[in-house]
């Protein structure tokens, strides 16, 4: 097996909160995932295995490195005060293919399966990285709270007297929108892209690991992002990027 082109991969994403204890703006350190798409055949390692990168059947029981998760908690404790309104949590991420947001029944199912968050990214990259022996640190920003309550019933007598406008407002409560995801990302930009990222990266770099930091949050306020007017990506080395495709 060839040595990996990097030792550590840090990824971030925006996710819907399934855990009722989570709030919009909370940051969650991933410790496990549910790859729902992978269970039905949508898997990044399908096809002939590239033996130079890893084994045919890699184990994912320890996909999220414990040491890196500990460093993330230590860095957060060092940078936040008791008065901070943003919490750092640790939980399980459910990956779905999208692009639609989840139905209420799907949200209840995912939460019942043990997921704390749900999103449409990150897990394929993590699987490819772990296949190549790369350590993973993954962080989610909770950008909206998933709706777990059952949908309104057509025979609900309490709804019969509602005006169409009131009915629309009632049914729209908690509905996920892309705009609220963008807004939550912009609000968290300073914490996530400057303070937290810098401290965690410095903590990891102290171990002299080579680090790839993949930034997926929108609305970053640091100068480099404003100049590029785009997401920030530190490029994967060529052969790793080709394997990821």
Please provide the spans of the model-predicted regions.
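Glycine-rich phosphate- or other oxyanion-binding loops that anchor nucleotides, phosphorylated ligands
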Residues: 1-148, 175-201, 213, 219, ...
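Catalytic-face loop-and-helix region of soluble metabolic enzyme cores
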Residues: 145-179
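Eukaryotic N-terminal low-complexity, Ser/Thr- and Lys/Arg-rich leader segments
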Residues: 155-167, 202-210, 222-245
């Amino acid at each position: 097996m060839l040595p990996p082109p990097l030792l550590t991969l840090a990824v971030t994403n925006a996710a819907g909160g399934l855990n009722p204890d989570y709030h919009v703006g909370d940051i969650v350190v991933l410790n496990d995932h549910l790859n729902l798409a992978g269970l039905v055949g949508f898997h990044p390692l399908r096809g002939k295995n590239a033996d130079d990168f890893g084994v045919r059947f890699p184990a994912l029981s320890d996909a999220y490195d414990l040491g890196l998760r500990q460093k993330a908690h230590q860095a957060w404790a060092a940078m936040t005060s008791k008065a901070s309104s943003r919490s750092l949590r640790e939980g399980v991420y459910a990956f779905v293919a999208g692009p639609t947001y989840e139905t209420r029944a799907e949200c209840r199912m995912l939460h019942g399966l043990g997921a704390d968050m749900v999103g449409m990214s990150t897990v394929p990259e993590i699987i490819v990285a772990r296949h190549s022996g790369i350590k993973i640190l993954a962080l989610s920003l909770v950008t909206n709270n998933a709706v777990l309550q059952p949908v309104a019933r057509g025979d609900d007598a309490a709804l019969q007297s509602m005006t169409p406008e009131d009915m629309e407002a009632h049914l729209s409560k908690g509905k996920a929108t892309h705009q609220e995801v963008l807004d939550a990302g912009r609000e968290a930009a300073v914490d996530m892209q400057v303070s937290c990222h810098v401290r965690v990266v410095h903590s990891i770099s102290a171990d002299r690991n080579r680090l790839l930091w993949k930034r997926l949050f929108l609305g970053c306020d640091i100068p480099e992002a404003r100049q590029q007017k785009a997401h920030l990506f530190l490029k994967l080395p060529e052969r790793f990027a080709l394997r990821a495709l």
